[in-house]
């Protein structure tokens, strides 16, 4: 199937699942600890070569924490030579002035640093790591020093959303150019912890109001900082156009070489190919995995005849699978879905008090335990 299939313009290279942090909202798979056979430097070079030949123009380096890879600078340099626009998506842990300097020399175009909270204590508690806030703060200053645009990302959830004003103030203190205030998206560990992370509707309305007030203040001051507020689809009545459609422009390569149409698709009961076994072109145009939800032939009636199908492409397949057990079902976010009550139930559960101590942190011990127990809830273990 090649007719009507677009180019894979955006390549996400998940270099590793290893990470020094333990964020309970991480989108990595719960069983990430069993996926250890990472692509080599040369194998990544080959992936980049093929993707560029196919028309890919933007390359994101992600993880896990991509800075764990000691060959990151080599990978960036190779991508730069090919003409990619390169973006490092990082927690800032493992970043040093020397590495920033080397990445700059290698041709890295963009660095996005994530924070957990504006308060150091809350930030480090959510990260499951001591001194994480201090490290991030210092790296932000160095990113500015090396003339990168300052792009900060905060995953917003019920434990930090009420400090949205302080979060924005921190970003202004750091001279951020762009701030993404993204309400938690519930995949991987975030889905496991959904009840403890989903903000209430009241919290969400307040946070968006405060963000809009800051936007007006910044506009009046002719301030360059741009605030982006990403709402959760759990409070919508129509689904998002996930990844702008399955297999339309987005290509993810997992650490072990599995090729995916989005970073959450690994959990689906679908066979996805590996770049060690097939070319990217064959994977993109011919593989069952990438063609599975292209077009509308797969859609159940109701979705197929819906006038919005060309806008939302049926919503998120991973979300449909996680909530209903069948990835072909209508995304339960949709108010027309037979499963919309599951979203309404999640909204109701957000009103139940939940402390940080009830969250399951993302670390290898919990991942291994989850893998062994296979869907039996894991204990809350925080690695020292």
Swiss-Prot record:
Asked if Iron-sulfur is a keyword of the record, the answer is: yes
Q: Which residues form the Radical SAM core domain?
A: 5-220
- Pathways involved: Cofactor biosynthesis; pyrroloquinoline quinone biosynthesis
* Cofactor binding comment, as recorded: Binds 1 [4Fe-4S] cluster. The cluster is coordinated with 3 cysteines and an exchangeable S-adenosyl-L-methionine.
Q: Name one GO biological process term.
A: pyrroloquinoline quinone biosynthetic process
* GO molecular function (one): oxidoreductase activity
Q: How does it assemble?
A: Interacts with PqqD. The interaction is necessary for activity of PqqE.
Per the record, the similarity remark reads:
Belongs to the radical SAM superfamily. PqqE family.
The name this protein goes by in its record: PqqA peptide cyclase
């Amino acid at each position: 199937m090649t007719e009507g299939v677009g180019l894979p313009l955006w390549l996400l290279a998940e270099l590793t699942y290893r990470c020094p942090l333990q964020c309970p909202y991480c989108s990595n798979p719960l069983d990430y600890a069993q996926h250890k056979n990472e692509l080599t430097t040369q194998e990544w070079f080959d992936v980049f070569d093929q993707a560029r030949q196919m028309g890919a123009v933007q390359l994101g380096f992600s993880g896990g924490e991509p800075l764990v890879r000691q060959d990151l600078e080599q990978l960036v340099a190779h991508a730069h030579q090919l003409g990619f626009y390169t973006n490092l998506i990082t927690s800032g842990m493992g970043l040093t002035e020397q590495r920033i300097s080397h990445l700059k020399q290698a041709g890295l175009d963009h660095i996005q640093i994530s924070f957990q909270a504006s308060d150091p204590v809350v930030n480090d508690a959510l990260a499951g790591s001591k001194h994480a806030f201090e490290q991030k703060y210092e790296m932000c200053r160095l990113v500015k020093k090396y003339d990168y645009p300052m792009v900060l990302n905060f995953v917003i959830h019920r434990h930090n959303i009420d400090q949205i004003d302080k979060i924005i103030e921190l970003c202004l203190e750091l001279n951020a150019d762009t701030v993404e205030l993204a309400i938690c998206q519930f995949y991987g560990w975030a889905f496991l912890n959904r009840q403890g992370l989903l903000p209430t509707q009241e919290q969400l309305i307040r946070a968006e109001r405060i963000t809009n007030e800051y936007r007006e203040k910044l506009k009046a001051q002719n301030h360059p900082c741009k605030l982006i507020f990403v709402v959760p689809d759990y409070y919508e009545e129509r689904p998002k156009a996930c990844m702008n459609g399955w297999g339309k422009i987005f290509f993810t390569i997992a650490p072990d070489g599995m090729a995916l149409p989005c970073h959450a698709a690994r959990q689906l009961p679908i066979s996805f190919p590996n770049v060690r076994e097939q070319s990217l072109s064959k994977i993109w145009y011919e593989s069952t995995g990438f063609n599975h939800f292209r077009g509308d032939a797969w859609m159940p009636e109701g979705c197929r005849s819906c006038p919005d199908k060309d806008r939302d492409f049926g919503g998120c397949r991973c979300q449909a699978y996680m909530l209903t057990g069948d990835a072909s079902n209508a995304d339960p976010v949709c108010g027309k879905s037979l499963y919309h009550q599951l979203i309404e139930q999640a909204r109701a559960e957000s009103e139940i008090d939940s402390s940080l101590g009830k969250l399951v942190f993302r670390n290898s011990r919990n991942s291994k335990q989850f893998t062994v127990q296979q869907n039996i809830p894991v204990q809350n273990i925080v690695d020292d």
